[in-house]
Amino acid sequence: MSDLFDGELYKKFFEVVGSPEEGKRISQAKAAQALGYSGGVISAYKSQAYNGDVKTLEKKIAAWLKREERRLDRLDVPVAETSALEKIRRAVTIAQDEGDIAVVIGDSGTGKTTALRQYAKESHSAILIEVDPSFSQVTLMNEIARAIGVDHKGGQNAVVERVIESLTGRDAVLIVDEADYLSDSSLELLRRVINDKSKTGVVLVGLPRLEFKIRNLKNDHQQLQSRIGVLVKLGKLKKADAISIIAGVWKGVPTQIFDTFIQTANGSTRTLVKLMGRVHQIMGLNKANTPDAEIIAEAGELLMR
């Protein structure tokens, strides 16, 4: 190998980067994108023919490899059987069985999205759509079309007809996460097209403002409100649920450690999971086997609560 290249770094990089057929974890294209280079640069580096600034490239590679090592060591918190998951499961089941509309609301961090993804993973018939503030009626219908495997090209009317045809008679339920971002007309489109015309159950999930939006009589949502058969309101994380989540990672910790975690998380599932991740990082740095109050306090200082 040329003296221009760091042989050890080169070997370490290509132990991770390459094709899946070679058993590599990350493709050259993804590595190039992460590093801010073209695929051609990585190919040239692999063949030791790169004639650009090798030192700068290798500095970026070294820093990226360290970040990847940290990512691999990130704590994977198993999905626990919480009351939020059970409530969502019940609401979705009713909506699907009865072809009804269900609304699930909860503050940010109550575990809605995690529970929905878990339900969609368990179910063979749930269609999960995660919307964002940029979604228009057209974007929404195109996303639904893609999710159910129908052609989303062409005018909106054509896409709507394909969606109706595909869903009619199909044992399915459409779950829309972050539905509070949808406009009034998009919510009405879901009611008319998905629920009315295709007779498919719909579950709208979002922040509490979703309920206010639907109930607002200044908007033409009376028909939507009258179709809602289930309304679920998720509260703060319950102590028993928090213990289940923590015990999924650290079994047999003292009661006071559970209490410290719960107090620091302040009723938020998302905060608890992030807190556990930071605790795991600090434990690794301190070579600790179990979490303690001092580590939890240090981890809590890194979170916005």
What are these regions (language model features)?
Residues 67-81:
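Conserved adenine-nucleotide phosphate-binding loops and their immediately adjacent elements
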Residues 79-96:
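Pre-Walker A adenine-sensing motif
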Residues 136-137, 142, 151-189, 195-201, ...:
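Mid-core helix/loop region of P-loop NTP-binding domains shared across ATPases and GTPases
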Residues 123-133:
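Conserved catalytic segments around the Walker B and adjacent sensor/switch elements
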Residues 96-118, 132-133:
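Walker A/P-loop nucleotide-binding motif
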Residues 1-59, 63, 222-223, 233-236, ...:
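C-terminal alpha-helical "lid" subdomain
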Residues 124-126, 217-236:
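A short helix-turn-beta junction within AAA+ P-loop NTPase domains corresponding to the substrate/partner-engaging
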Residues 101-108, 194-220:
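Sensor-1/coupling segment of RecA-like P-loop NTPase cores
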